[in-house]
Amino acid sequence: ILDAPLLTVHTLSGPFRVEGAQPGDLLIVDILDVGPIPQEDSGPLAGQGWGYTGIFSRNNGGGFLTEQFPDAYKAIWDFAGQTATSRHVPGVSFTGIIHPGLMGTAPSAGLLATWNNREGALIATDPDRVPPLALPPEAEHAILGGVPRDQWARVGSEAARTAPPRENGGNQDIKNFTKGSRVFYPVFVDGANLSMGDLHFSQGDGEITFCGAIEMGGFIDLRVDLIKGGMETYGVSENAIFMPGNVEPNYSHWLAFSGTSVTLDGEQKYLDSHLSYQRACLHAIDYLTKFGYSPEQAYLLLGSAPIEGRLSGVVDIPNSCSTVYLPTEIFDFDVRPSASGPFQIDPGMGAPSAANK
């Protein structure tokens, strides 16, 4: 995790050309099935009965709370049917919400240039920032398939990195892209050129540790169709719309934590929802440590368990309010506040770590 080669992550399956797809259409993608490597209960590869959650170090990608957690950590999760448990985060078990973190169509040449121009301009405002503000094209590590060799340098210098979500879909990390979901992607090039990857066994809203879902290898079974001229007909000029599947865990009891747009040292910010979600997560972490978890164990849990994150208020100046809903039924003990005080767990071996370089 400390030295994870981020230049080569997100190797995608595809692109798949869809016959008849043209710019302006909507590409319908049905997720018929998705899961870990089938009929594999154990093995050396993630997805063979296990997966992992990582906290990237601040100097190698970082995460949502990288200032509070600058080092690298991981948790290994074991799969039993739909359930995940971990020797590194004891006392919890939860039903996975299996989904692809990344899926989308190809951009047009003009849209690709727009991405590179705007992200390059952002990087230029603070080029030495750690972690960086954005990730520019990296020709040396671009996977260019059948592109003629004499064009590799040009194409590699323009090829978009797959880390962020963009107008084409991309790395949205929406945990609700489950089996049974139907997604409507805008089409920008002939054939649509659909790609996908980054399968997750489970994830909390926000994927807050960056490598925050339970990462795994696996399979996905898709069906595609088209709505001709659908981008104009339905006003979907950019970014996908989707209908979630109906296979999510049915948790009914929650403990919610809130945060506002005030920094840890008390500075007031204006309607900063990013900050308010950070504060809500930190409040949840502080709470879980009272039961015996280390802060890192709690952070890993929030990234991997099916927590719900919400923008609860975005208009009441100067503070936005974000909330994190933690399903209480995933714990082997009563995690709710009571007069008897917090139950003390045995934190076990803890989360393996490596110090930030």
Could you describe each region identified by the protein language model?
Residues I123-T125, R129-L271:
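Conserved mixed alpha/beta catalytic, RNA-binding, or beta-rich assembly cores of soluble enzyme
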Residues V18-A21, F177:
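Short, well-ordered loop/turn sites that connect or cap secondary structure elements
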Residues I285-K357:
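TerminUS-proximal long segments
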Residues N246-G303, I307-R310:
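Extended, compositionally biased non-globular segments
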Residues H10-F16, E167-Q172, I285-Y287:
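Short alpha-helix capping/helix-loop boundary micro-motifs
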Residues D33-T178, F184:
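Intrinsically disordered, low-complexity linker/loop segments enriched in Gly/Pro
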Residues L26-V29, Y185:
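A generic structural signal for residues embedded in beta-strands
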Residues V34-G49, G191-F201, L311-V314:
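Short, Lys/Arg- and Gly-enriched loop/turn segments at beta-strand edges
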